[in-house]
């Protein structure tokens, strides 16, 4: 079952962050053609709310922190009962969480480390197995599961190279490599390298195509959607009529439908859209209320999808103290 999930962060008082913020996870209900809240909880003010859902067991995994913490830890919540567990007790920074074939994966920087790297989380021992604990130079970005290759798609660059005079003062572009990495983290297959532009996000569209959002330089200019032909290594821009900028996206497994967070021409608000590459049909997907900040968009493929019958799981402040 293919499920579209959108992560947003809303101000609890509806106006500003004075009273804190909450993580809200929406799932798109194809039957009603509407977003429905499946999970809501207050989160720490410094947290990047990485999350993923195990729909078979109706459990959400998410990064959060107690009010006095400036670092992340991993939590789980049973969507049926609201039971919350804190699964780690360290100083982490999570960029991505993925649930694939019954296993929880993370892209995470652990305590005393600068860079994020892929890790596999053992739910029984509640411990991480990292790709390479000795490597604190390689940044791993845009961690996603590639259903076509049955491996992970990853974007990497060197922290040391990023800080060189050539990159920091001249090009302002981090040389990056798009690669496949298997579930053991031992076998890596490079697919594409460039330092002609800054790659922000990558996702597999079909057998021979990767889509990516790019910027002319680091944190500079509007994001552009590009298409990479893996075989020929040719790159071309993908223009979406009526859209001035695509910030993040996720393709459907049909190889044609693209879900993305973007800005319409002449607008400043970010919205979620569905776009058909063949017909160029563009549809805005609406929320019950406009989110304060759209953080992430992802598509999961699992044996089952959301169970809307038990409604939304809403946690109060004490959920963070368990």
Task: Report each predicted region and the residues it spans.
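Blade-level signature of beta-propeller repeat domains, shared across WD40, Kelch, NHL, RCC1
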Residues: 271-273, 280-322
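Short, conserved, GDST-rich strand-edge loop motifs in beta-rich repeat architectures
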Residues: 4-19, 65-66, 109-110, 156-172, ...
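Repeated scaffold domains used in trafficking and secretory/extracellular systems
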Residues: 45-52, 92-101, 137-147, 196-204, ...
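Surface loop/turn motifs at the tips and blade-to-blade linkers of beta-strand repeat domains
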Residues: 39-44, 87-91, 132-137, 191-196, ...
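Short loop/turn segments that connect beta-strands within beta-propeller blades
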Residues: 29-33, 78-82, 122-126, 182-186, ...
């Amino acid at each position: 079952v293919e499920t579209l999930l959108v992560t947003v962060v809303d101000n609890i008082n509806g106006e500003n962050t004075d009273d804190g913020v909450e993580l809200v996870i929406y799932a798109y209900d194809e039957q009603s053609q509407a977003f429905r809240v499946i999970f809501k909880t207050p989160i720490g003010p410094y947290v990047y709310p990485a999350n993923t859902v195990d729909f078979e067991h109706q459990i959400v995994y998410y990064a959060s922190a107690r009010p006095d913490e400036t670092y992340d830890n991993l939590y789980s919540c049973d969507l049926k009962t609201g039971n919350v567990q804190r699964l780690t007790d360290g100083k982490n920074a999570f960029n991505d969480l993925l649930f694939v074939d019954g296993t929880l994966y993370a892209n995470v920087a652990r305590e005393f480390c600068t860079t994020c790297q892929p890790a596999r989380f053992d739910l029984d021992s509640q411990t991480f197995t990292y790709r390479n604990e000795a490597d604190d130079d390689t940044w791993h970005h845009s961690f996603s599961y590639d259903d076509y290759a049955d491996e992970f798609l990853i974007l990497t660059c060197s922290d040391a190279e990023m800080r060189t005079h050539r990159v920091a003062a001249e090009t302002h572009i981090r040389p990056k490599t798009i690669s496949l990495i298997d579930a053991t983290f031992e076998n890596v297959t490079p697919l594409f390298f460039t330092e002609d532009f800054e790659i922000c996000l990558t996702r597999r569209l079909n057998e021979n195509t990767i889509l990516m959002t790019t910027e002319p330089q680091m944190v500079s200019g509007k994001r552009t959607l590009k298409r990479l032909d893996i075989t020929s290594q040719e790159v071309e821009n993908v223009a979406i009529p009526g859209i001035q900028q695509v910030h993040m996206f996720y393709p459907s497994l049909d190889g044609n439908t693209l879900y993305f967070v973007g800005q319409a021409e002449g607008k400043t608000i970010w919205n979620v859209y569905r776009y058909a590459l063949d017909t160029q049909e563009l549809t805005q997907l609406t929320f019950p209320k406009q989110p304060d900040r759209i953080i992430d968009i992802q598509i999961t493929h699992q044996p089952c999808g959301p169970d809307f019958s038990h409604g939304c799981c809403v946690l109060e402040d004490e959920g963070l103290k368990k």
